[in-house]
Swiss-Prot record:
Cross-referenced Pfam families: MlaC
Record's function text: Plays a role in toluene resistance.
Cleavable signal peptide: 1-22
InterPro entries: MlaC/ttg2D, Tgt2/MlaC_sf
Cellular component aspect of the GO annotation: periplasmic space
Family label: Belongs to the MlaC/ttg2D family.
Location within or outside the cell: Periplasm
Protein name: Toluene tolerance protein ttg2D
Keywords on record: Periplasm, Signal
Annotated source species: Pseudomonas putida (Arthrobacter siderocapsulatus)
Gene expressing this chain: ttg2D
Length: 215
């Protein structure tokens, strides 16, 4: 009897972390990830400034589990191109996409000096899709809006899109991918291998857009 109880307790303890993750709300996911990321950044910022690879590994470790990289990659390619891609091409694009995005946008995190971040309650949570807003205070004191779209995938909420300061990142990258495919004569490998340059162009386009602050 004791042996059965012990085994039952071990099973319960092993399953508890999974139950905890599954029970997280969209707000919990965004708030928890933000808190962990900023805590790690505060402790290791100087190291990350001199070691970009360590910074990428940290971002991937913290953000990877809560980002729907597969869904985002297919969305950027759109059905037109993703259905033609081999599993190897999709995997390569995912890796190039994640690394280039974190490299180009990670610099903004290194410049963050605890000015202030507020995560709003989730909106339109129907159990499958939800939106979570965030307000980020810049160095100049202005407050910028960020909007996360999350989807429930297998009982876990994962980020599917982000709107930063009024700029829809998913749409921006979709347009950039389609334009690159045109310029590359529909050569999927060439577009995938040159994706870092496309992210740089997208970032420049975003940087040149008018700023939208929260009043």
């Amino acid at each position: 009897m004791i042996s059965i109880l012990r085994r039952g307790l071990l099973v319960l303890l092993a399953a508890f972390p999974l139950l905890t993750v599954a029970a997280q709300t969209p707000h919990d996911v965004v708030q928890g990830t933000t808190t962990e990321l900023l805590g790690d950044l505060k402790a290791n910022k100087e190291q990350y400034k001199s070691n970009p690879n360590a910074f990428y590994d940290a971002l991937n470790r913290i953000l990877g589990p809560v980002v729907d990289a597969d869904g985002i990659s297919k969305s950027i390619m759109t059905v037109k191109y993703s259905r033609k891609a081999t599993p190897e091409q999709m995997q390569r694009f995912q890796e190039n996409f994640k690394r280039s995005l974190m490299q180009f946008y990670g610099n903004a995190l290194l410049e963050y000096n605890n000015q202030g971040i507020t995560v709003d309650p989730a909106k339109a949570d129907d159990g499958k899709r939800a939106s979570v807003g965030m307000k980020v205070t810049g160095n100049n004191g202005a407050v910028y809006p960020v909007q996360y779209t999350l989807e429930n995938i297998g009982g876990e909420w994962k980020v599917r899109n982000v709107i930063v300061n009024g700029i829809n990142i998913g749409k921006l990258f979709r347009d950039q991918f389609a334009d690159a495919m045109q310029r590359n004569g529909n050569d999927l490998d060439k577009t995938i291998d040159g994706w870092a340059g496309e992210v740089a162009k997208a970032k420049q386009a975003a940087d040149n857009s008018p700023e939208k602050t929260v009043k």
